[in-house]
């Protein structure tokens, strides 16, 4: 389906150079002389690159047929990560390269958002917050409590993040997957 530049909005999925893209920002610009244009900043959903492009007012582009499904992570066999559709119970294998950064935060049974284009998964997003155990952490040094003092801690997934000094090895914590920061105790 074709969509006009006047209908652009942030988050809209369109096809550019035969690849799906998501509009991050758009701005209508009317110069004093000449035709009005729409300046668009978008992210390629396959490569992740952010690109700027200018369209003439009234131009149209193809809208991307993209589905976002909530799927539960089941297990990984090295190359393929197995996910199950939460509503149909259908299982699909997704290549580890497509899973990307989400693999740092998921260990099993988490509900992730899987983006599908042309019946193929193109990206996986971890839930915004996950609860993980601390696998390895040095004890906090008594007296080393300057405001906001932190120490490195390795999580059960192998990722190392900064946590407050009072958090100890074996504790479950809440982590913000978008920033990779400690969010609180569980």
Name the predicted role of every residue range.
Residues 2-156, 160-186:
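Acidic-enriched and Gly/Ser
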């Amino acid at each position: 389906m074709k969509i006009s530049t006047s209908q652009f909005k942030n988050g809209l999925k369109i096809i550019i150079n035969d690849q799906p893209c998501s509009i991050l920002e758009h701005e209508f610009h009317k110069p004093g002389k000449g035709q009005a244009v729409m300046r668009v900043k978008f992210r390629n959903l396959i490569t992740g690159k952010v690109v700027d492009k200018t369209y003439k007012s009234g131009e149209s582009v193809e809208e991307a047929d993209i589905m976002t499904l909530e799927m539960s992570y089941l297990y990984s066999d090295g190359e393929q990560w197995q996910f199950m559709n939460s509503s149909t119970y259908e299982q699909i294998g997704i290549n580890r390269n497509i899973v990307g950064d989400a693999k740092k935060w998921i260990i099993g049974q988490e509900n992730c958002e899987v983006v599908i284009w042309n019946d193929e998964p193109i990206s996986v997003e971890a839930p915004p917050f996950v609860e993980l155990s601390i696998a390895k952490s040095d004890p906090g040094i008594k007296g080393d409590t300057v405001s906001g003092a932190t120490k490195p801690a390795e999580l059960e997934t192998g990722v190392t993040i900064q946590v407050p000094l009072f958090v100890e090895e074996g504790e479950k914590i809440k982590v913000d997957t978008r920033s990779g920061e400690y969010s609180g105790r569980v």
